[in-house]
Amino acid sequence: MNLILMGLPGAGKGTQAEKIVNDYGIPHISTGDMFRAAMKNETELGLKAKSFIDAGDLVPDEVTIGIVKERLSEDDCENGFLLDGFPRTIAQAEALEGILSSLGKQLDHVLNIAVPKELLMERLTGRRVSPTTGKTYHIVYNPPKVEGKCDIDGSDLIQRDDDKPETVKRRLEVNEKQTKPLIDFYEAKGYLRQVDGNQDMNTVYADIKAILSEKRA
């Protein structure tokens, strides 16, 4: 089962990825994990990536694609994989097709967890944190016992800058602009499967399992 998982921040990708890899016995491969492993193992490409990251630069496609190819060639990917955070561009998607072809593999499904923007805003801007205990709450989904106060020590909860509406809105817009061409690309190729993320997480996963039980036409 060779899969790509897509979805905007707040769509619940992490939760669903964990369920998929546990049930199907395939590795969850995120770009960050790949970079960290390649740098830790001091592979040639890992060292190249490190030099760009240390300089505060974006890692060029050729290095990223090389690291992806190395990772997908490993033994644990023999029965499949779940890619998360790659590809991010059409050029990377086309390169991935070449990688899979060279490995005698092809994609089965591209899952896109779709959630209305206003719900993503609610999920992402509702987070509150205690600056003293580090405990995280959500004003809708996991509120403290006393509004605005930490359950543990009564400290005032704060909203991190990353969770403020203007920051979240900008992040969603950037992500949406980036992923729209990829969604169109995979839809045209018949790989795309839209998943309704505006449901409880178990229902979302039941929908994903139903999709994964189908054979691609």
UniProtKB/Swiss-Prot annotation:
Known EC number: 2.7.4.3
Any one of the GO BP annotations: AMP salvage
Catalytic activity: AMP + ATP = 2 ADP
Domain of life: Bacteria
Binding site for ATP: 10-15, 127, 136-137, 199
Segments of this protein annotated with the region NMP: 30-59
Keyword Membrane recorded: no
Cited InterPro entries: Adenyl_kin_sub, Adenylat/UMP-CMP_kin, Adenylat_kinase_CS, Adenylate_kinase_lid-dom, P-loop_NTPase
Region: LID, residue numbers: 126-163
Compartment(s) where it occurs, according to its Swiss-Prot or TrEMBL record: Cytoplasm
Pathway(s) this gene product operates in, as recorded in its UniProt entry: Purine metabolism; AMP biosynthesis via salvage pathway; AMP from ADP: step 1/1
Entry similarity comment: Belongs to the adenylate kinase family.
Subunit details: Monomer.
Domain remark in the UniProt entry: Consists of three domains, a large central CORE domain and two small peripheral domains, NMPbind and LID, which undergo movements during catalysis. The LID domain closes over the site of phosphoryl transfer upon ATP binding. Assembling and dissambling the active center during each catalytic cycle provides an effective means to prevent ATP hydrolysis.
Protein name: Adenylate kinase
Organism of provenance: Shouchella clausii (strain KSM-K16)
